[in-house]
Amino acid sequence: MNHSERFVFIAEWYDPNASLLRRYELLFYPGDGSVEMHDVKNHRTFLKRTKYDNLHLEDLFIGNKVNVFSRQLVLIDYGDQYTARQLGSRKEKTLALIKPDAISKAGEIIEIINKAGFTITKLKMMMLSRKEALDFHVDHQSRPFFNELIQFITTGPIIAMEILRDDAICEWKRLLGPANSGVARTDASESIRALFGTDGIRNAAHGPDSFASAAREMELFFPSSGGCGPANTAKFTNCTCCIVKPHAVSEGLLGKILMAIRDAGFEISAMQMFNMDRVNVEEFYEVYKGVVTEYHDMVTEMYSGPCVAMEIQQNNATKTFREFCGPADPEIARHLRPGTLRAIFGKTKIQNAVHCTDLPEDGLLEVQYFFKILDN
């Protein structure tokens, strides 16, 4: 690999001390994984070229948040023509929608998405109102099956995702297979609709046909104006909170973790991807400050990339789910509770795959923090 090749991005960092947005040039050298930063306003080097293992080429796309030495940077633009040419056409976004009939198979479908080289950049379990369903299916309103389509898409929760990769629209359509699941089982037996769908309407998942449809549909579910889009599905009863930590999301473990939670008999009644900032994480983890020696490392891990928060429902949810997660240290978990989430998916006491609520009285509060306060 060419060690002099570099990609340049314009990045912003919010300085909490000065309450200012500071702008930098971020240079990434894929040959040796090193980074360099220049202060745009003051025209000076902010960080000399330094090897940094936690930033990868696939993290570099406009709109993404990346962590460089504990600073959370938002990539807002390309820094030069070469970077724009090389990386601009490389990544394409599309909408992936898991329909009500396949919600119980969300783990399997997300696993297929990850294995196909997609990055999930947004995710939210939602309940569509009739009006939202009509807006979504506006292209089908002259079709004879239109009313059945609207009825079906509003019968239960859906999961909407923004997914990213080269040629995303075509690749996602290929993974889905033919629109009718019966046809898919004959013509594309390994496709998502063949595996998890029933017929032409109850066909497990959806993907837009064109760049224009993808843009229109993503705007419905994830408005660029900063609005919430359709409502989340949190019920705020008999619940506890689970968060799939950024390292586990980035390692492509989300699908496997969802399958494990379902197979253990828990109901995932709400789910959403969040990019937390340091202030939010410190607020959420406040109960651990001064109590847990790893507090600062826990905070840094939780805002190092996107995490996925869930509302988990079951009787005595906090206690039973905490037992299913296992001891905080995965090494101890592997010896004492080898079937638990942290034993199977955790790496270290900080990167232990999941956070779960510790105290029964905090279950509802933690769920409310994500699904009432942050999803606002």
From Swiss-Prot:
Location within or outside the cell: Cytoplasm, Cytoskeleton, Microtubule organizing center, Centrosome; Nucleus; Cytoplasm; Cytoplasm, Cytoskeleton, Spindle
Q: Name one GO molecular function term.
A: ATP binding
Among Pfam families, the record links this protein to: NDK (PF00334), PH_NDK7_N (PF25364)
User: Coiled coil located at which positions?
Assistant: none
Expression tissues: Expressed in airway epithelial cells.
Q: What is its EC number?
A: 3.1.-.-, 2.7.-.-
Location of the DM10 domain? 3-91
Is Nucleus given among the entry's keywords?
A: yes
Q: How is it modified after translation?
A: Undergoes autophosphorylation.
Q: Which CDD domains has this protein been placed in?
A: NDPk7A, NDPk7B
Q: Which InterPro entries match?
A: DM10_dom (IPR006602), NDK-like_dom (IPR034907), NDK-like_dom_sf (IPR036850), NDPK7 (IPR011410), NDPk7A (IPR035525), NDPk7B (IPR037993), Nucleoside_diP_kinase (IPR001564)
Q: Which GO terms describe its cellular component?
A: axonemal A tubule inner sheath; axonemal microtubule; centrosome; ciliary basal body; cilium; cytoplasm; cytosol; extracellular region
Report keywords, A-Z: Cell projection, Cilium, Cytoplasm, Cytoskeleton, Flagellum, Hydrolase, Kinase, Nucleus, Transferase
Domain writeup? Contains 2 putative kinase domains (94-224 and 239-372 AA), the first one is involved in autophosphorylation and the other may be inactive.
Q: Assembly state and interactors?
A: Component of sperm flagellar doublet microtubules. Component of the gamma-tubulin ring complex.
Job of this protein:
Possesses an intrinsic kinase activity. Displays 3'-5' exonuclease activity with a preference for single-stranded DNA. Does not seem to have nucleoside diphosphate kinase activity. Functional component of the gamma-tubulin ring complex, implicated in the regulation of the microtubule-nucleating activity of the gamma-tubulin ring complex in centrosomes, in a kinase activity-dependent manner. Part of the dynein-decorated doublet microtubules (DMTs) in cilia axoneme, which is required for motile cilia beating.
Q: What is this protein called?
A: Nucleoside diphosphate kinase homolog 7
Q: What organism is the protein native to?
A: Homo sapiens (Human)
What taxonomic lineage is listed for the species of origin? Eukaryota, Metazoa, Chordata, Craniata, Vertebrata
